[in-house]
Structure formats: structure tokens, C-alpha cells
């Protein structure tokens, strides 16, 4: 049985070998390029299903708050303008935007597989099918989850005798984040990953993501010196910094799950 100290040393060794700080920076750049195409695809899919009309506003709030917790209103206005402009594009332009979104998913796929040291690549056709499924079904899953959460929230708010339920309801965003991370760490690597290892890594990532968002918002609000330096351009560095922190959290959780997998395989041998 490996000690906690040795586990920590192995985790840090793998984290350094995989250069996850630099990888988070590269994914941040890819995310900035793919953000508008992703949002365009998501809301285009939502517009095709009238049942999601009521949750579209909540989805926008969730996306903008997670990408830039302290500047969500301004980011939301910019993204809305970009998406509105994209509707005037030709078919070739739209295909190009979708290709950029698929490239981001491909980068995420390759990054997570490298963390698991998986050299077995999927066939191009299989990869495209999986990426397209993520791009199309992902928004629907998120929409259904938001709709269910909204329904539960309304149900609890209409009752005066469910104060405990209202308190428990505050954990729904965390549980949803935990579930999404667990799903990513289990499905994306092109190898069998034990669900409990994915859940452990996802739990750590969900905690860091939730606390990090609150701490980041507090820092930006409490120490607004960045506004004096950047002025009207302050939103851009804020968003870049938060996206990089978010990717670092995702990669830390993935590395934890991968390290647990590695130790588990050594014990079985």
C-alpha cells in the first residue's frame, strides 16, 4: 500500500512530466478561439428545440458566469454580438466555425489521453463521430439538467415547509459539476478508467472549481487595480486568467484520476 507522501510525490512527478501548466495555457488559447463557435452551435441546437426556450437565459448566465465570474455581463454582451454576427455568415463560414469547435474538442481529447499515457489513437471516423456527438448532445444534456434544476428550485420556492430542501438545493450546482467531470474523466480517455478513480479526481476538480470561482470573484471585486491598468480592456485579461485557472483545475483532477489508475494497475500486478 503506497503512503500518502509517496502518492503526493508521484502525483507531482506526473504533473511536472506532463507540463500541465503549459498545457493549460495552450488550452486557454484554443478556448478563446473556439468560444464563439461553441456558443453559436449550442444556442443553434437550443433554438431547434422549443422546449428549451425557457432555460436558454439560464444557460447563458451559467456559461458567462463560469467563463468570467466578475465580468459576466460585459462578456455576455460581446458573445451575443458575435453570435448575432455569425448568423449572417455563409455556409462555408459556418462550417469553418464548427471545425474550430471540433478542433478544441480534439485538443481536449489528446490532452487527457496524454495524461493517461495512452498511445492508442482512435480511427479518424470514430473520433469525428465522438466529437460530433459531444458537440450536439452535450448542449442537450446541459439543457435538460438546467431545466430539471429550475423545476426543482421553483417547486421548493413555492413551498414554505421545505427549508431543509432549499439548503440541500444549494449543492445541486456542485453535484452537477462533479458529475460532468466524472463523465469526462471516464469517457474521454481511450482506455478503461475505473469510475471510482474518475469520481475521486472529479470531486477534487469540482471543489477547486467551486472555491476557485468564489475566490477569484472576491479578489477581482476587492482588489480592482486591474481596471486602473487595463481600463476598458480589463475584461480580456480577467477572462484569460479565469479560463486558464479553470483548465488547470480540470487537468489537476484528470492527473489525480490517472495517478490513482496507475497505482491501481501496479497493485494488481
From Swiss-Prot:
Pfam family, one: Virul_fac_BrkB
Keywords of this entry: Cell inner membrane, Cell membrane, Membrane, Transmembrane, Transmembrane helix
GO cellular component terms given for this protein: plasma membrane
Cellular compartments annotated: Cell inner membrane
Main location per the UniProt record: membrane
Recorded superkingdom: Bacteria
Keyword Ligase attributed: no
Residues that span the membrane, as ranges: 32-52, 89-109, 128-148, 168-188, 203-223, 232-252
Entry keyword annotation includes Membrane: yes
Entry membrane topology: Multi-pass membrane protein
InterPro entries: UPF0761_bac, Virul_fac_BrkB
Cited HAMAP family: UPF0761
Family stated for the protein in its record: Belongs to the UPF0761 family.
Protein name per UniProt: UPF0761 membrane protein HI_0276
Organism from which the protein derives: Haemophilus influenzae (strain ATCC 51907 / DSM 11121 / KW20 / Rd)
